[in-house]
């Protein structure tokens, strides 16, 4: 079965700030989008790459990834207002043919081959997978500034991307979410959350990630990513 990577690069980057959109900021001479695309281009188990970008930036992004350097890129499409909208547009663009699909945030440019391969292997036996790392910090629950609970740390993992699914599974989960008037107020902020909420019978397998697979949220994160690339 084919495996397609969807690089989600349609975020607004409000916390990052600056005149240049975050996904077009450079890290070690390449934009954040290119780092993610290059990682999936190099992955033997990836058959195609679809890039979802901010409306108005598609021309710039096409110039970066449809220049012959990345042969697996099949298209660049406009995303939506929210991450959920962007995911749904990607699902529609992938069509009806069954495949495995990995959704990856372009804001995580240091994704490695071991993690990608782990997702692909897991999808050989599972219908949904999510990359996770253990939490080294104690996580607490709070309401109105008052601590209300302290979940067991050994039961907590931090989510990263990629998140992978059989296409028909993630498509069905989003169909159910779209039909639910209460979805926009739910805690399902990513695709694994949508599956957990609307297809509880589908097990979501945890795939070990890496602390290097950090998310670029603030300008200072670029400095840390540069240091990690230098080793």
Regions found by a protein language model. Give the residues of each.
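N-terminal glycine-rich phosphate-binding loop and ensuing alpha1 helix
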Residues: 1-58
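Short beta-strand segments
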Residues: 6-10, 51-52, 104, 131-134, ...
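Hydrophobic packing residues within well-ordered alpha-helices of enzyme cores
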Residues: 16, 61-62, 119, 139, ...
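Conserved N-terminal catalytic core of the sugar/cofactor nucleotidyltransferase
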Residues: 34-98, 180-181
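Residues at the starts of beta-strands that form the adenosine-phosphate
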Residues: 47-49, 100, 127-128, 203
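A residue-level structural signature of the nucleotidyltransferase/glycosyltransferase Rossmann-like core
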Residues: 50, 108, 128-130, 148, ...
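Conserved beta-loop-beta/alpha segment of the NTase-like Rossmann-fold superfamily
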Residues: 75, 80-143, 155, 159-161, ...
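Conserved alpha/beta core of the MobA/IspD/sugar-nucleotide pyrophosphorylase nucleotidyltransferase superfamily
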Residues: 158-231
């Amino acid at each position: 079965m084919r495996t397609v990577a969807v690089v989600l690069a349609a975020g607004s980057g409000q916390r990052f700030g600056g005149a240049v959109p975050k996904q077009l900021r450079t890290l070690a001479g390449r934009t954040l989008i290119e780092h993610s695309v290059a990682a999936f281009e190099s992955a033997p188990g990836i058959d195609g790459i679809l890039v979802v970008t901010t409306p108005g930036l598609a021309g710039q992004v096409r110039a970066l990834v449809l220049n012959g350097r990345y042969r697996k890129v099949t298209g660049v499409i406009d995303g939506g207002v929210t991450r959920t909208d962007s995911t749904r547009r990607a699902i529609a663009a992938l069509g009806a043919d069954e495949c495995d699909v990995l959704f990856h945030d372009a804001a995580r440019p240091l994704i490695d081959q071991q993690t990608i391969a782990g997702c692909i292997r897991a999808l050989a036996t599972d219908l949904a997978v999510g990359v996770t790392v253990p939490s080294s910090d104690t996580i607490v629950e709070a309401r109105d500034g008052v601590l209300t609970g302290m979940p067991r740390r050994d039961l907590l993992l931090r989510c990263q991307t990629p998140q992978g699914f059989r296409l028909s599974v993630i498509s069905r989960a989003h169909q159910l979410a779209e039909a639910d008037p209460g979805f926009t107020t739910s805690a399902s902020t990513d695709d694994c959350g949508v599956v957990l909420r609307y297809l509880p019978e589908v097990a979501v397998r945890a795939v070990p990630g890496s602390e290097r697979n950090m998310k670029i949220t603030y300008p200072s994160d670029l400095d840390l990513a540069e240091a990690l690339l230098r080793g």
